A protein has these predicted regions:
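Helix-start/capping segments and mature chain N-termini
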Residues: 1-80, 102, 106-156
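Phosphate/pyrophosphate-binding loops at sites that engage ATP/ADP/AMP, CoA/4′-phosphopantetheine
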Residues: 82-86
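Ordered, amphipathic secondary-structure segments that act as subunit-interaction surfaces
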Residues: 87-95
Length: 157
């Protein structure tokens, strides 16, 4: 599925993927001031949606990003994407940005969030991966220091 076949929901407005636009003054674009969560559907049902939204809220709390949508409102917008795309297995990326405003480091310069939901066909791994298996390598990278941002925070910052 190409970008033109994807659906993007921006603050409740459904758009084709190649028509979706967000302001270059959005802090998510300018500063990475956003959080995101990724899940998928199985037979049009979002997988562990409550848990993913809980983690989205925890990530937002880690960067002091108040979310102006309720989990129920986000679920409604996800359902709109699922209905519009009308396929059973969908990749869902849920993004909350701090929003657009004056350029500056003060987060209060952006009073309203932007909610972006990207919905596209979930690409499946090749069948042989499941039948034959695949090889992976585990890196010897050390963990982040304890005083750094929680590595479970899902953000672009």
């Amino acid at each position: 599925m190409s970008i033109t076949e994807s659906i993007v929901n921006i603050n409740g407005t459904l758009l084709k993927g190649d028509e979706a636009k967000i302001s270059v003054f959005d802090r998510g674009f300018l500063l990475g001031d956003s959080v995101y969560e990724v899940t998928r559907t199985y037979e049009s049902i979002p997988f562990l949606l409550k848990e993913h939204l809980d983690r989205l809220w925890r990530s937002a709390e880690q960067i002091s990003l108040p979310i102006s949508y309720s989990p129920e409102q986000i679920k409604v917008e996800i359902d709109k994407c699922i209905k519009e795309l009308a396929i059973p297995n969908i990749y869902l990326r849920i993004i909350i940005t701090r929003g657009s405003g004056e350029i500056g480091l003060d987060p209060d310069l952006s009073p309203t969030n932007n909610l972006v939901i990207i919905a596209k066909e979930q690409l499946e791994y090749p069948k042989w991966w499941y039948e034959q298996g695949v090889s992976f390598v585990v890196a010897n990278t050390l963990r982040n220091p304890k005083n750094s941002l929680d590595p479970n925070t899902v953000s672009y910052t």
